[in-house]
């Protein structure tokens, strides 16, 4: 298993995006046209027929991202540059029952709140406050 931490990121949330086909595509196409690489994406239903889209970018791109979004979209935008990503990689991670719960419980036991989650068959990535990255990394090593 490989554990990686990344402090060089920022979380951006675009609030109240219409929940209809093509909206997320338009948003991320626009950022791509400006050479913005997206590290992680999470979406949650908003009020009514809207959604909130959160994503992580390299912190050096944050100002550019916010300026692009403010010019093109009327939605509320929030961001946090005091976050970090913690990722666990393992070939076959998805075949280990309960691994996500074990990781999330460990974070909770250490009073570390998860801001974003992304999973795949071989990885689990969480965005947490940067000040907790070292503690979370060491605690994760202990439970694995």
Listing of model-derived features with the role each one plays in the protein:
Residues 1-144:
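A conserved regulatory-domain signal marking ACT and ACT-like small-molecule sensing domains
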């Amino acid at each position: 298993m490989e554990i990686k931490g990344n402090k060089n990121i920022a979380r951006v949330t675009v609030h109240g995006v219409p929940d209809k086909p093509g909206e997320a595509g338009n948003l991320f196409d626009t950022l791509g046209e400006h050479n913005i690489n997206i590290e992680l994406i999470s979406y949650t239903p908003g009020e009514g027929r809207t959604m909130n889209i959160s994503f992580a970018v390299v912190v050096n791109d944050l100002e550019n991202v916010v300026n692009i979004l403010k010019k093109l979209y009327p939605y509320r935008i929030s961001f946090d540059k005091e976050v970090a990503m913690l990722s666990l990689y393992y070939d076959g991670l998805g075949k280990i029952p309960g691994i996500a719960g074990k990781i999330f419980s460990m974070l909770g036991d250490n009073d570390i709140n998860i801001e974003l989650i992304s999973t795949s068959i071989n990885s689990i990535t969480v965005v947490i406050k940067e000040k907790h990255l070292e503690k979370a990394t060491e605690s994760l090593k202990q439970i694995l």
